[in-house]
Amino acid sequence: MASKYDPQIAESKWQGEWDKADLFKAKSPADAGDMPKAYVLEMFPYPSGRLHMGHVRNYAMGDVVARHKKAKGFNVLHPMGWDAFGMPAENAAMERNVHPGDWSYQNIAAMKAQFAKLGLSLDWSREFATCDPDYYGEQQRLFLKFMDKGLVYQKKAKVNWDPVDNTVLANEQVVDGKGWRSGAVVEQRELVQWFFRITDYAEDLLNEVQKLERWPEKVRTMQANWIGRSEGLQMRFEWADASDEILRQHVADLDKVMSEGVEIFTTRPDTLYGASFIALSPDHPLTIELAADNDALTSFRAECAKVGTSEADIEKAPKMGFDTGLKVKHPFTGETLPVYVANFVLMGYGTGAIFACPAHDQRDFDFARKYDLPIIPVVKPSGDEASEPWVTSGKGADMDAAFTGVGTIMNFDFLNGKTIDAAKSEAIAKIAELGLGKKTTNYRLRDWGVSRQRYWGCPIPVIHCGDCGIVPVPTADLPVELPRDVSFEKPGNPLFHHPAWKDVDCPKCGKAAQRETDTLDTFNDSSWYFARFASIDDQAERAYWLPVDQYVGGVEHAVLHLLYARFFTRAMRDVGEVDLPSGEPFAGLFTQGMVTHETYKSAEGKWLEPSMVARDGETVTEIATGKPVEVGDIIKMSKSKKNTVDPDKIIATFGADTARWFVLSDSPPERDIEWTQSGAEGAARFVQRVWAMFDDLPDTKPAAPEGKSDLRVASHKAAAAMDKAIEEFRFNAAIAEFYTWLNAIKKGAGEPDANRYEAASMLARCLPPFMPHLAEECWARIGGEGHVSAAAWPVSDQSLLTEDSITMPIQVNGKRRGEVSVPKDMAKDDVEATAMAEPAVKAFLEGKTIKKVIVVPGRIVNIVIA
């Protein structure tokens, strides 16, 4: 036997053995019999062509769960596929002059080879890529079923346009006013778009997310905030007589506009008496109509459009307004309020119009100060703030900022002295009595715009006919495949410039028609892939596997992929595609931390890769030049900062088990982990320690162990503790048990061979979730049957987990003076006698008068002295 473990030889050997044995293929429901099922899934990767250490950590965590479940007797489904559509492939095609499909499939092959080196327990029999026609053909069929159900519609809408990627972005894909992929400043354009009615499920999505007890609280909160349920008042402000002339000049349907007034939604009807102006969104229908023949308002709207589209950008932007000259009547006082167009009002929330109460909303306050509008306080604070000058005077002129806290109502006629909640209810009731409005529930969530003006995506399966309108592609004609002969020379969508593909006959009337040239947002592809892994078309098998029992992925997907997947599953349920009453796709969710690394800059200010620098104590230099290197922050590994570590190089140097061990051991899995060379070297040394321990075992399997030795107790406790730690996603705690266990085995070198063999056998069976290749080699070394990756988790002997003795502290007048170890079932009198005889306690009590001794069984001994 080799004196040193060689990971390169062992890992290649065992990966081949697993493949030959088809060890990780899930059993069919019929073959599984009474086995419980466990569907373990990590968010499938985009095939960029290279794995990074973040991938290694994510998939290693999923593998820990999958291997542990298999060892516990579960029928495990642990599949892998590829999220292959999207703009990066299309951009790569343009840059490299290759077809996006060729580029994607080449990358898939390269990454699949990398996955194999990691020793993951994946069921590759269910592999697919979302760019496979079979996959997106099924997606097209789902689209048509959603369409039949009324969950799909088309409308002209203001969209977020990415001028670099030449496509529409969903609100969630706009980050700080920029495209989430390109980083370009997003523009607003009006286009005809396809939408999914996700808002039909808003209430259900909100209510049910709080019931997902095995999801992180942070993710549940993020989804709840994104859905954004708010209760308030929707009411109509009627036009003042002074508005008649302006409306006659600028609006086409005067009667309609006059009768509707200005509809607003507010969550603060208690502040109605503090209203001093009305604000319309720049995209409000009335604003657009007024701007049609008003150059100044048109210019103002254009200026507003330059501000980013996100709420954060609008919040930070200087407040701007345009006085329309229109006025409305206050419903309670009859006074007139001016109507402005304001850049901080969002058309996508409520009605796109608000009443402004500057005294109690900071945006309104800033706007009122800028345009010299009244500020009327109507909420009186309590406590220290009650002595503010504006409270005493009741005048907004004395306010330095809006008061947004709680208090009681002032300056509000019939609501004075009421609490905010009581005032809200009474104000709503009064408005309803006047016939001007009613209590309403509103959602921040908007319908999902799914049209994208790109080639490399799932074609939308409809045909536009001049006579028949929108016609679904017949199911028999699916999939509508992407043409390969496309050109990326013209800007925009190549499908639009491909007449041979675009021009077709209408399937309804036979006349000339055109295909829809938009493709689906790629978040569609990942919104149902978990159901495809469960089964291609067998509803019973799909029902058996769903929901996913444990999903693993990044928290950055909280309000994108995870919300869309929850909607999709509900829609699939409602069209008969999944038998999942709850509509929840993921029973358990774990969001892992990132892998981070120091950043390095050369003397010339260029980013350097970790492999380009040398460290000698605190001194870091560039290997090529010998010049000092600036060591920067420890941040997420990034290609742009070059602080990445190539998993292939790590595996070639240390082996996959070392890489897995390190990314799982250094910190709790939900936290970020810093990759360090010294940490990897330490993990590699531990691999050799484990192997050396097995190397020292007898060559023949000894008799069964007996008795309650220290080593047996340590082994059975460690196996039980690791079992619990893995169940609770405390992988670093499970790994800590390994170190303790190995030390116990070293201390137990003098114990009988049977006890040492039992310890080694148990350790080998606990090792596969973390270091599967080493585990197989160790298992073979001690003559274990079959593959240890298929072996059962060791069952701990409960009698060995029970402590025979306990340690009790001894206090004298409330201060600890010693401790004593006694049998668990020792009588109180005997415990007292043993405690009194403890040398340190006995010495302390010498010459003192003992008043009382209190023994709390199993807990503590209290001695009271005079």
Stretches with model-predicted labels:
Residues G62, N75, H284-S382, A402:
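Catalytic alpha/beta core of large soluble enzyme barrels
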Residues P29-V98, E127-L142, T266-T267, P331-F367, ...:
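N-terminal catalytic cores of NTP/NDP-binding nucleotidyl/phosphoryl-transfer enzymes
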Residues M1-M35, P269, S281-H284, N294-D295, ...:
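Basic, alpha-helical terminal appendages of large translation-related enzymes
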Residues M1-L41, K70-P79, G101-A113, R214, ...:
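Conserved oxyanion/phosphate-binding beta-strand-loop segments in alpha/beta enzyme cores
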Residues D83, L144, D148-W161, K439-C468, ...:
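Helix-rich, typically C-terminal accessory recognition domains appended to large enzymatic cores
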Residues K4, K13, E17-A21, E95-V262, ...:
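Residue patterns forming the tRNA-binding/recognition surfaces of aminoacyl-tRNA synthetases
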